[in-house]
């Protein structure tokens, strides 16, 4: 008799980027009274919660360094590896860079899950690294109470083309390269409420590499770029606005979303990270309905790129998007700071 299929999500208390520590708590953890070491060649550190660190090694070249790991968001081990690797590599693309190598991070409950299952996870990560044109060059593993997998990724970028999350300008249009709703659909699957026609949609979305980011880097009018992950669209947009000294207007109806997300929200398929995100960022946001809040605060795992684009660069952005098989439409715009308004306002 065949043994039942392993459900990895049963072995962890969190899922994907929804495992992230809330921004409020993270601020307390990272607080320090120590004087910060100053290195003029460190172009991007953690001051603005950017996607990766960037270090100037001379001759116009910057090294990008980032790491990302989490607990299973899907049951299939190979897919878990694919998703975790795609998510980790995304931070390099979000800085406008090109990945050059990765090393693996693995935590595994060896008394609960067979090593052959961990091997499938690693194979999923290796597969995505090959898609990105890089080697999975090594790694580190520990015996852990819950399965954890991710990568530490190294990339390169022109120091003139680094895309920070803190350089956006008033007048920029906002573009999002992947639909929202990943946390909602994966929660629906975990609750056995996902309809047959929607199976696999979230997984394939999470496994799409954000390669266009390396091409968007060549456009000066792309003033800021980040990837939308565990803090949701509102969280990551808030960081752009706060870091850049601007405010935003979001057009809710223009925001791409996965099929039937509103229906699943109505059925209670809302991940726990949604509430944590709102607790951290809700005071910065204007009026919105419960439905809007639950979608816009939905924690994304391996979500899309969020771009701030000056009007004269929109055609170039659309051209690159088309080369990658995407059609983009603006989801909002950035405005000058005005203390009479919320940091982000939601309109229909």
Swiss-Prot record:
Chain sites annotated for binding ATP: 20, 48-50, 68, 91, 139-141
The EC number on file is 2.7.9.3
Any one Gene Ontology MF annotation carried by this entry is: ATP binding
Q: Write down any Gene Ontology CC term.
A: cytoplasm
Q: Which cofactors?
A: Mg(2+)
- InterPro entries xrefs: PurM-like_C_dom (IPR010918), PurM-like_C_sf (IPR036676), PurM-like_N (IPR016188), PurM-like_N_sf (IPR036921), SelD_I (IPR023061), SPS/SelD (IPR004536)
Which residues are named in the active-site annotation?
17
A Pfam family per the record: AIRS
The cofactor binding remark recorded in the entry reads: Binds 1 Mg(2+) ion per monomer.
Positions annotated to bind Mg(2+): 51, 91, 227
Show the catalytic activity. hydrogenselenide + ATP + H2O = selenophosphate + AMP + phosphate + 2 H(+)
UniProt-listed GO biological process terms: selenocysteine biosynthetic process
**UniProt-annotated site: Important for catalytic activity, residues:** 20
Name the keywords, alphabetized.
ATP-binding, Kinase, Magnesium, Metal-binding, Nucleotide-binding, Selenium, Transferase
Which top EC class applies here?
transferase
Judging by the UniProt lineage, the source's domain of life is Bacteria
Q: Which CDD domains match?
A: SelD
Briefly, what is this protein's role?
Answer: Synthesizes selenophosphate from selenide and ATP.
Name the NCBIfam families on file.
PRK00943.1, selD
The UniProt similarity line reads: Belongs to the selenophosphate synthase 1 family. Class I subfamily.
Describe its partners and assembly state.
Homodimer.
Q: What is this protein called?
A: Selenide, water dikinase
């Amino acid at each position: 008799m065949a043994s039942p299929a392993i459900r990895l999500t049963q072995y962890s208390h969190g899922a994907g980027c929804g495992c992230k520590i809330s921004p409020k708590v993270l601020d307390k953890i990272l607080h320090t009274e120590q004087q910060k070491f100053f290195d003029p060649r460190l172009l991007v550190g953690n001051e603005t919660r950017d996607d990766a660190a960037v270090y100037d090694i001379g001759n116009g070249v910057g090294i990008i360094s980032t790491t990302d790991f989490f607990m299973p968001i899907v049951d299939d081990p190979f897919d878990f590896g694919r998703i975790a690797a795609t998510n980790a590599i995304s931070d390099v693309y979000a800085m406008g860079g090109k990945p050059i190598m990765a090393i693996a991070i693995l935590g595994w409950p060896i008394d609960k899950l067979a090593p052959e299952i961990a091997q499938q996870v690693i194979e999923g990560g290796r597969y995505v690294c090959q898609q990105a044109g890089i080697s999975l060059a090594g790694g580190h593993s520990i015996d852990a109470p819950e399965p954890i997998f991710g990568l530490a990724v190294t990339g390169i970028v022109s120091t003139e083309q680094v895309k920070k999350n803190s350089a956006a300008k008033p007048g920029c249009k906002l573009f999002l390269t992947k639909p929202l709703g990943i946390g909602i659909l994966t929660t629906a699957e975990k609750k056995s409420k996902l309809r047959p026609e929607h199976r696999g949609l979230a997984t394939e979305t999470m496994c799409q590499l954000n390669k266009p980011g390396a091409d968007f880097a060549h456009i000066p009018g792309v003033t800021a770029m980040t990837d939308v992950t565990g803090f949701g669209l509102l969280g990551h947009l808030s960081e752009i606005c706060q870091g850049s000294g601007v405010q935003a207007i979001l057009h809710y109806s223009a925001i791409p979303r996965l099929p039937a997300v509103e229906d699943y929200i109505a059925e209670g398929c809302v991940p726990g990270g949604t509430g944590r995100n709102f607790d951290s960022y809700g005071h910065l946001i204007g009026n919105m309905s419960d439905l809007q809040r639950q979608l816009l605060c939905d924690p994304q795992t391996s979500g899309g790129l969020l771009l701030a684009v000056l009007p004269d660069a929109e055609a170039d952005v659309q051209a690159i998007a088309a080369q990658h098989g995407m059609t983009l439409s603006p989801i909002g715009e950035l405005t000058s700071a005005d203390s009479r308004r919320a940091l982000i306002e939601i309109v229909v």
